[in-house]
Regions:
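Long, charged, helix-prone linker segments
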Residues: 107-135
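Conserved helicase C-terminal RecA-like lobe
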Residues: 2-94, 98-105
């Protein structure tokens, strides 16, 4: 057993990727949720990113620098989405023969399969239809 982080450069005959949903692997869509954001905060702001952005503006000497609430949260989301997509790629490419990917609906049932997983499933189904064979 290994994490995706520690598996880079390694391969196994069978790989299991768990919880590939829009919380653990968000795509940047409006309905995605993020670990760094709390549901009870207005506009689901990432407080750490917003605080750092405010500190940068305070230290800035430019006349045209200003704090735009929410921009830092959006930037942090996109950074997180990129990092998680790279990590998912690492996980997928560790499989030599078998790749098993699962997702869950979360505690409240509001989670969906990750958009990247849905795209992969669509691609796989196209290939099966085009070339035949079992999935």
């Amino acid at each position: 057993i290994s994490t995706m982080h520690k598996s880079k450069g390694l391969e196994w005959d069978r790989v299991y990727l768990m919880s590939v949903n829009n919380y653990d692997f968000p795509s940047g869509r409006e309905y995605d949720r993020y670990i760094s954001e709390s549901w009870f905060l207005r506009d689901h702001l990432n407080l750490e990113a917003e605080a750092l952005a405010q500190l940068e503006i305070l230290q800035s000497t430019g006349d045209y620098d200003w704090y735009d609430e929410g921009r830092a949260s959006q930037s942090a989301r996109m950074d997180y989405v990129s990092e998680r997509l790279r990590l998912l790629y690492v996980g997928i490419t560790r499989a030599k023969r078998d790749l098993i990917i699962t997702w869950n609906g979360g505690r409240d049932g509001g989670m969906r399969p990750a958009e990247s997983l849905s795209a992969l499933i669509g691609y796989w189904e196209e290939q099966m239809n085009e070339f035949g064979g079992e999935g």
